[in-house]
């Protein structure tokens, strides 16, 4: 093979939306709280970043308008309390989702192992089957594997979409 020849990657069997639908169905069947907590965490995080974004303009408007010191300190204190509350709520929700996500991951491992134990003996000798089994098993083995990263990615995507919507609403 020459340098100019491109090696084609095999096309994935399933697309992102099919994988998302599958993970949501597994989560809904095993731990219904996981998708709901992912959305709640995204809303909470977007609210926190919105409050962080609005604190400077609020304080500066108080300073520019010559508001009394009590109002200025009240605005700073109000935003501080709001940020503390939202940070604590986000932290709490993030820890709540950990148990559900682990349950979903265990269900995925159970399905992978069930597939392996119920397969034909010939497949157990097939190198391609064993590699696919190992790949699926590795995807669910720990908190940093893709079976767990799925939820973090979708939380981040939802947070960014909500934040973008808030930003657009503030600009209009």
How should each PLM-predicted stretch be described?
Residues 1-49, 63, 67-75, 93, ...:
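Membrane-integrated ABC transporters
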Residues 39, 55, 76-80:
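Residues within membrane-spanning alpha-helices of integral membrane proteins
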Residues 12-15, 74-80, 84, 88, ...:
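Long, charged/polar-rich coiled-coil alpha-helical scaffolds that serve as structural arms
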């Amino acid at each position: 093979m020459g340098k100019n020849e491109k090696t084609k990657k095999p096309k994935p069997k399933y697309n992102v939306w099919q994988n998302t639908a599958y993970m949501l169905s597994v989560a809904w069947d095993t731990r219904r709280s996981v998708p709901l907590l992912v959305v709640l965490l995204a809303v909470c995080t977007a609210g926190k970043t919105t409050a962080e974004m609005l604190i400077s303009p609020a304080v500066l408007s108080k300073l520019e308008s010559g508001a009394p010191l009590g109002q200025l300190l009240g605005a700073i204190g109000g935003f501080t309390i709001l940020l503390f509350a939202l940070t604590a709520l986000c932290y709490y929700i993030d820890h709540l989702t950990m148990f559900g996500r682990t349950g979903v991951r265990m269900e995925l491992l159970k399905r992978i192992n069930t597939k392996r134990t119920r397969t034909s003996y010939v497949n157990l000798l097939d190198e391609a089957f064993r590699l696919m089994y190992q790949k699926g098993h590795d995807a669910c083995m720990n908190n940093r594997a893709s079976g767990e990263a799925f939820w973090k990615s979708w939380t981040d995507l939802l947070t960014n979409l909500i934040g973008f919507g808030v930003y657009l609403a503030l600009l209009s």
